[in-house]
Amino acid sequence: MAAPRRLIVGMAGAPGASYTVSLLGRLRQLGVESHLVTCGCSRSIIYSETGLGLRQLCSRADGWYHERNQAAAISSGSFLNLGMVIMPCTMRSLAAIVTGVADNLVQRAADVTLKEGRRLVLAMAESSSSRIGQENLRHAEDLGVRILVLPPAGPTLTVAEKNEEILACFGLGDAAARAPAPR
């Protein structure tokens, strides 16, 4: 059975909220249902980067979940979807995902996404020069995770291009034909 056109969008903190706001708008344009989960650290950054309050951000998604709600629909493999993107993703969240630790709903939904063989894209807000960080990135890629690095949010064109790259990972958007096939 084909997955419904729905995508889980996680925000794990760090700079990059403008990318998420733009992605939610683009998903709505494409008629793709979006389910947003935010961590506390990301909520504190949203306003400073975008001028939006949490309610305004959540109104751009079809569903919103609190990070502590591990019983949410998106924490179950029976919640059919195209996959998940965590944007921005921190090195801490990456480490939790590759080790199977699920302390919050962002990490739990990522764990379920991998378990179900769905596409997981981590849009890293930072690159790591530490050996541990590099090993975690390699481990994630070995698990089939697509890793992207977010440049500092700047021109609208840069944000739009990165979002099209993310959408293409799921067979969506203008760049879908140029991306590797979703797994």
Which residues does each PLM region occupy?
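A cross-family phosphate/adenosyl-ligand binding-site feature
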Residues: 1-121, 125-183
